[in-house]
Structure formats: C-alpha cells, structure tokens
Amino acid sequence: MEIEKQHVYISTVEVENLSDALFSGDEENGGSEERKTEINGNWIPATSITEAKINAKAKRRLRKNSSRDSGRGDSVSENGETQKAGLVVPTSPKGKVLDRRSRSGKGRGLPKKGGAGGKGVWGTPGQVYDVEEVDIKDPNYDDDQENCVYETVVLPLDERAFEKTLTPIIQEYFEHGDTNEVSEMLKDLNLGEMKYSVPVLAVSLALEGKASHREMTSKLISDLCGTVVSKTDVEKSFDKLLKDLPDLVLDSPRAPQLVGQFIARAVGDGILSSTYIDGYKGTVDSIQARAALDRATVLLSVTKGGKRIDNVWGSGGGQQSVKHLVKEIDMLLKEYLLSGDLLEAERCLQELEVPHFHHELVYEAIVMVLESTGEKTFKMMLDLLKSLSRSSVITMDQMKRGYERVYCEIPDINLDVPHSYSVLERFVEECFQAGIISKPLRDLCPSRGRKRFVSEGDGGRLKPESY
C-alpha cells in the first residue's frame, strides 16, 4: 500500500523530472524502451500522466480567467502552448463576442430579412386584413358608435377676425380680378351673420382706390349675390354704408358721390331693388346720405327703364382701346392749353391708368408744338413735360420712347410743316436744358441738310434763311 500511495501522490516537480528523464533516456537509448508506472494495479505510461496533468493545469487557468480579463495577458491553450494577447483562443469567451448568432434561442427582436415577423411588424408589406366585425355581445359595445360621420367645424368669424381675414382677399382680387376665386375662398370661411359686411368692406377699400378698382368691386358684388350673399344682405350692406358716410368722408371726400354711384350700379345690375331709394324719401337726416341718394337718383333717371349702367365708373386700365386712349389724351392736351392747369392735367393722366401708354402723350405734345405757330404752345408743352418728368408720372423710358417716335416720323411731318426740323431741334435743346431728356437722346435728334442754292458758288456768299 505504501508503494501504491507513493506512486499515486506524485508531485508536479517529480512528474516534470520524470518527463525529462524519460525523454532524455529515449534520446540516449534511441527510444528502444518506454517506462511505465503502476497505478491501482494498472500499468500506465508516464507520458499519458504527464499530458493529463498539463491539460488539467491549462483548463484551470482558463476557468480562472474571466471573459473581461481574457483580452489581457497571455493564455495557455489545451496543448500547453502559450498564446499572445493579440490571438484569441477558439474556446475563449471573447470569441463569442464576435459571433453574430443569437446568444439565446429567442433572438433580439429584429425583423427577419425575409420581411414578415419581428418586433413591431404586422405581417408582410401589402398584406390586406379583413374588416373587423363589431360584436354586439361585446361588453364594450356601444350602439352610438355606429354610422358616425365626422366633419371639421369652422367657428364663425368675429368682427376683428373678419376684417383681418377678408382685407387681404379683396386687395388680392384687385390684382387678379377673378371673382370665382374670391367666391371659393369665402365659401371656406364661416361668415355667419357677417355676410352683409362683405360688400361693405369691398366698397370701403374701393373708395380709396382707382376707378378700375371701383368697377371691379361692382362686378364682385354682382357675382357674389346669390352664391355667398343674398339680396337682403346687399340691402343691409348699403344701409350700413349710408349710415357710416360721415366717417367715410374723413378719408374719402368724394365718398357720398361714389356711394351713390355704387347704389345706381347695384340697381342697374338687378341685385338691389328699384324701390330701395324710394324707401329713404323723407327719412334721411344725414347730409352725406342725402347727397349719395340724390346722385343715385340722377344716374338712374338718365338711363331708360333702369337699364344696366355699364359706364358709371368709365373704362380704365387695359380695358380701354388704343383709339379711345388716343382720343382721351388729345382732349387732355387741348384742355390743358385752354386752362393751363398742370395739376388737373396730371390728375387726368393718372386716372387713365395706362402708364405703359404715356409715350403717346409725349408724342402728341411734341407734334402740337411742331404744328403750332406761336410761342405759347411751345412754352406750355415744355412746362407740362417738365412737370410730369419731375413728378415721375412719366418715366424716362416712356419719355424716351415718345421722342424716338417723333424722330422716326419727322420726315412725314415735315411734308405738312416745312419748318418742323428747326422747331424740333430747338424744342429738344430746351428739353435737354430743363433736364427732361438725356444728352444721348438729344444727340439722336435728326437734322435736315441745308438746301444748296445755285448761286451759292458766287463768291462763296450764302443766301439768307428768308430767301
């Protein structure tokens, strides 16, 4: 037993010495013999015991090193070989960090590459579900939920929000002139009891605008009647306008006459009753309201049978024909020659609302100067062009275009007016001195070559101009 215990409890040092002796003996003897050890009556080769000890020691080291320390220091493989820190042993826990497979059988909850399934995914893309049927026996069933129709409720506009919302709409209408667009925008609003205020606001803005704006306002009220507002609303709106005339006069002195024209146009369009004016007889205390009703009465009495009044505001802007504009400008210049009022001539030109056609006035004014025989027309037209140029009513581009038209047609004008070249040169020079035209435009003025006389060669003496 003592012998067996001695064989069993062999220290590590003895095993190593034994291994060294064994291998050294093999080398000396050429490996002819193999030493054996008896354990529990069994003879086991010494090499097997040595390998078992080394493997056990290596496994203990691996178990001792945790996964957090596996990346530091050296490790020993199962074969007893030392591994460097940069190399990862296949059995090391760090090898599982680089493994892309799930560490548990349930996965990480990500959708599959094929499409359907996964956390937060409701089937394949494009999958159609059946309509969920309502269970009447469900404890949470509510019969009031069936056949429900949901719609957006728009609150009615108050007075402040009404003016803030509709003012940009009407001002934009003055630019594009599309009544259908205004009608669609007003239908989207819940006007409530403020419908009658639509014509009131439109007329109030038109009083401060141009004649074309007032014409567009009359057309807008006529088109909105029956779709957005009713005839009762139109009557109510004009009642309010007549009542507010004392305040409107402060901003627009011509408000009574203009409101009277709006009333006459509304009666002519058929959106206001013909007896509307008669209802105010003897009941009007305001001077402004009485003046407005008198103006409407006069306009309606001129027409036959209350026909539609189309020209109550005149035709302004691009609605006018070229022939009509030429006639208006000719009358404007003739009235100016009679009155000499520069401000009135400027106002009449602006009321035409044709800034793109102002070159016609420049052309007609110069032609009148060429056709005139006295200095009065010359001086008055020079003052007119100077005033219009300084006030920027006529732009430099329109002024230049008017002069260029005269330059092109001066040969034809000279057939009727023999001295037109000399008069034109003088007028152009005066305009340049007054700052009306530029130097390049003055230099473009054509000049007719002097006629050569037969006797011009006699001593080089020239004939006088009056010859």
Swiss-Prot record:
Induction: Up-regulated by viral v-myb. GO terms for cellular component: cytoplasm; cytosol; nucleus. Inhibits translation initiation and cap-dependent translation. May excert its function by hindering the interaction between EIF4A and EIF4G. Inhibits the helicase activity of EIF4A. Binds RNA. Does not seem to be involved in apoptosis. This is Programmed cell death protein 4. GO terms for biological process: negative regulation of DNA-templated transcription; negative regulation of JUN kinase activity. The keyword Iron does not apply. GO terms for molecular function: RNA binding. Residues 161-282, 324-447 form the MI domain. Expressed in a broad spectrum of hematopoietic organs, such as thymus and bursa. Lower levels of expression detected in the kidney. Keywords: Cytoplasm, Nucleus, Repeat, RNA-binding. Interacts with EIF4A. It comes from Gallus gallus (Chicken). Residues 21-43, 57-124 are annotated as: Disordered. Belongs to the PDCD4 family. Coiled coil: none annotated. The keyword Transport does not apply.
